[in-house]
Swiss-Prot record:
Region Disordered: start-end pairs: 326-350
Originating organism: Rattus norvegicus (Rat)
Entry's Gene Ontology BP terms: alternative mRNA splicing, via spliceosome; maintenance of gastrointestinal epithelium; negative regulation of transcription by RNA polymerase II; negative regulation of transforming growth factor beta receptor signaling pathway; neuron differentiation; protein-RNA complex assembly; spliceosomal snRNP assembly
Compositionally biased residues, Polar residues: 337-350
Subcellular location: Cytoplasm; Nucleus
Gene name in the database record: Strap
This protein's name: Serine-threonine kinase receptor-associated protein
Stated role: The SMN complex catalyzes the assembly of small nuclear ribonucleoproteins (snRNPs), the building blocks of the spliceosome, and thereby plays an important role in the splicing of cellular pre-mRNAs. Most spliceosomal snRNPs contain a common set of Sm proteins SNRPB, SNRPD1, SNRPD2, SNRPD3, SNRPE, SNRPF and SNRPG that assemble in a heptameric protein ring on the Sm site of the small nuclear RNA to form the core snRNP (Sm core).
Example GO molecular function: signaling receptor binding
Amino acid sequence: MAMRQTPLTCSGHTRPVVDLAFSGITPYGYFLISACKDGKPMLRQGDTGDWIGTFLGHKGAVWGATLNKDATKAATAAADFTAKVWDAVSGDELMTLAHKHIVKTVDFTQDSNYLLTGGQDKLLRIYDLNKPEAEPKEISGHTSGIKKALWCSEDKQILSADDKTVRLWDHATMTEVKSLNFNMSVSSMEYIPEGEILVITYGRSIAFHSAVSLEPIKSFEAPATINSASLHPEKEFLVAGGEDFKLYKYDYNSGEELESYKGHFGPIHCVRFSPDGELYASGSEDGTLRLWQTVVGKTYGLWKCVLPEEDSGELAKPKIGFPETAEEELEEIASENSDSIYSSTPEVKA
């Protein structure tokens, strides 16, 4: 009998969670940032979901959020026609980058010196963060609003997606190398540096392409419209979520569906594997983030696996290791197909 998923539920947002991103692994662990229509992106400890802080300053929905590799900086994209760069340690706003329309996506180079942005004005912009007063470099060519833009190939190239097109750009010449056209709206895009793989979702399809050439590798079909998908760092598994509130887990090599379960109480907008591959996070229309174990029952983070006593005949089952601080209250709830526990939540100030 398979063990049941026991997700960690991260509350605190008051509107739909539309984007999330993990940092790399640092000496202090790894971190998770979430973008939400409430305009208040949040930073959390990646392996427990515990709230660290909220970045305050946007005056509209935040559509995109990212952390640099060592989690010292954060960047956000918002409906207030700005992208902002933040000190992720202090929470201070470092700079506001004014745009002419809604900003949807942000991405740091590996050295954190440049920020790529894209949005409703159909332009890609590259900001030199060491020269905040300088005008950004601009790349035009998209025919509709840009949903996602990512650095790839050690920052030598850029991948960007609008409504029905994915484009590959050369950073040095600022010119288009190749494009892919789809017959329906592209809902998400993920870049995997190891192996240079691009994961694209559209409709019920999850497609894998070479990030260098955009040549197809393989594709899966899901039972419902998919809004986001993420490939495990070791390329063992793929997880996806979408309009039917469910999370799907696939064997990447065979394409076999390994499990599916109701993950949220609303459509799932974003899913991502952690940098160590031990868990994945999902964000939803229901306003929550949830963290899920890749291997159910393994001792990791707040999940503590308790083996059964000899001859008891009981199955091993995951137990939750409760933090010993009064501030971190964890409640157990039941959802349709899974148990759930809560990570620590933001402090409410009068």
